[in-house]
UniProtKB/Swiss-Prot annotation:
Component of the ASTRA chromatin remodeling machinery complex. Its main location: nucleus. Belongs to the WD repeat ASA1 family. This is ASTRA-associated protein 1. Component of the ASTRA complex involved in chromatin remodeling. It comes from Vanderwaltozyma polyspora (strain ATCC 22028 / DSM 70294 / BCRC 21397 / CBS 2163 / NBRC 10782 / NRRL Y-8283 / UCD 57-17) (Kluyveromyces polysporus). WD repeats lie at residues 14-58, 84-123, 224-268, 271-311. The lineage of its organism: Eukaryota, Fungi, Dikarya, Ascomycota, Saccharomycotina.
């Protein structure tokens, strides 16, 4: 078991402000090599070649707002959410001219390998630092789940098409799950909580969206474009009915049609009352989600879908909220599945097949195996700080009163990839040396950590 912080194998230095998000992308069709996409506190989006460890692309958001979240959508599309309350989607394209740009204050010149076009931009509430969820529902068409524009305890859902700024359509507005959920939890030990709190994290898993809240509650829902609920107004008084009575009965059957409804399919209270800090798809089961909080629990979540995305025949077994936007089975209970890990205050989590990367508030990233044994500890220590234990002795300049204290840089984001082992012999425009380094990189698992001093570390596991 590892007990000490190890010296990182590689350190990427470009950002002058805190690294706020990192995403590793292995898309050899479009990027040719694995890349790392990083964002920082001054609005810089950077794409790195992780084989050469060099910057390939830099995009600076106007007025330098902090970048909150990054998502790679495939096909060289990158979504970026920033503190100027905007979600931007960039379409990258290989720049044959390879424009030269200044990449840092030391006036180093770097080739800009990509050019970009902003293919969509939408205002998003970022007062609570939550991220967003994007789902591709048709070619160049997406569904967005984000915080409500006025209340960060509620969510909005939009649909839009790329390259058509006037295509934005709000499907649902101000959805708050509290009243629906409290009815289900009324007879449980946590039934007295008065609100879910602000949304902390979104995570999409296929057609499901997990929402983690400040209260520690996790809710998973699926989107239903059309929902039919059948009720019968006819009161049967006799078992023998004429043809006319049967006709009247059929006419008295009322079918209510609801559009754009959300069905809650899963609830977890495992972290209550501690806030949800991060969510990650399990690398061992892509239908399972892991969660972290301020405690030492890693929540395990898997929604069980029983009836598919179909209309329900009646509403007897379901609760429909007053807004007619949310539906849930009356028998749905709360899950509390979790595993214990040897750390607390886990601000970031990334699941790997070999274990997990856990980014702690203490400035240390812990890599644990599948038995939750610590494999590696990653961190960056600031220069020693001299501290005087006594004000009187400091006047006397007594060296015995001086002690050395070390402080870690804060961790802002973690990521990781499993060794994939792929055939790279067919890749063009890559030297034998780069092929060898690429093969070595892809055959290993990696832990990537972004720190508040602007550095990004890469360590093999």
């Amino acid at each position: 078991m590892a007990t000490k912080v190890t010296l990182s194998e590689y350190t990427l230095r470009f950002h002058k402000d805190a690294v706020t998000d990192v995403k590793t992308v292995v898309d050899l069709t479009n990027f040719k090599v694995p890349v790392l996409i990083s964002g920082d506190g001054s609005g810089k989006l950077v794409i790195w070649n992780v084989i050469t460890r060099r910057v390939q692309f830099v995009y600076e958001i106007p007025k330098s707002p902090q970048i909150l979240a990054i998502e790679y959508l495939g096909d060289l599309l990158v979504a970026v959410l920033s503190k100027d309350h905007k979600l931007r989607i960039l379409q990258l394209q290989l720049d044959e001219s390879k424009t030269l740009v200044k990449t840092n204050e030391q006036s180093q010149i770097q080739q800009q390998l990509y050019k970009y076009n902003i293919v969509f931009e939408v205002p998003v509430n970022t007062l609570n630092f939550a991220n967003f969820s994007l789902e591709k529902i048709a070619p160049e068409e997406y569904r967005l789940v984000c915080c409500n524009t006025q209340n960060a305890e509620s969510i909005d859902i939009y649909a839009f098409k790329l390259n058509r700024l006037n295509s934005l359509k709000r499907l649902n507005k101000g959805i708050n799950f509290y009243k629906t959920v409290i009815d289900l939890l009324r007879n449980t030990e946590i039934s007295k909580f008065d609100k879910l709190g602000i949304v902390m994290k979104f995570l999409r898993v296929n057609d499901l969206v997990y929402c983690g809240f400040e209260s520690g509650i996790i809710i998973c829902f699926r989107y239903k474009l059309r929902q039919e609920v059948m009720t019968t107004k006819y009161n049967e008084t006799s078992s023998k009915q004429s043809k006319l009575q049967e006709l009247i009965k059929s006419e008295d059957t009322d079918i209510s049609i609801y559009e754009n409804m959300l069905e809650i399919v899963y609830i977890s209270t495992v972290h209550y009352p501690n806030p949800i800090l991060d969510l990650s798809i399990s690398a061992k089961d892509e239908e399972t989600v892991l969660s972290s909080s301020t405690d030492s629990k890693i929540g395990i979540h898997k929604a069980q879908i029983t009836n598919g995305n179909v209309s329900l025949p009646d509403n007897e077994g379901y609760i429909i909220d007053d807004s007619k936007q949310v539906i849930v089975r009356k028998t749905l209970g709360a899950d509390t599945s979790f595993v214990e890990v040897p750390v607390t205050e886990i601000g970031s989590i990334k699941s790997l097949k070999c274990g997990m990367v856990l980014g702690g508030w203490n400035g240390k990233a812990i890599v644990v195996d599948n038995n939750n044994e610590i494999l590696k500890i990653v961190g960056r220590t600031k220069s020693n700080i001299l501290v005087n234990e006594s004000a009187i002795r400091s006047i006397q300049n007594d060296s015995d009163s001086i002690i050395k204290m070390k402080k870690n840089y804060k961790i802002k984001a973690v990521d990781g990839i499993d060794g994939v082992g792929t055939d790279i012999s067919q890749l063009s425009n890559i030297s034998r040396g780069d092929q060898r380094r690429l093969d070595k990189f892809l055959s290993s698992s990696w832990c990537i950590v972004g720190f508040d001093d602007g550095c990004i570390t890469l360590d093999s596991i």
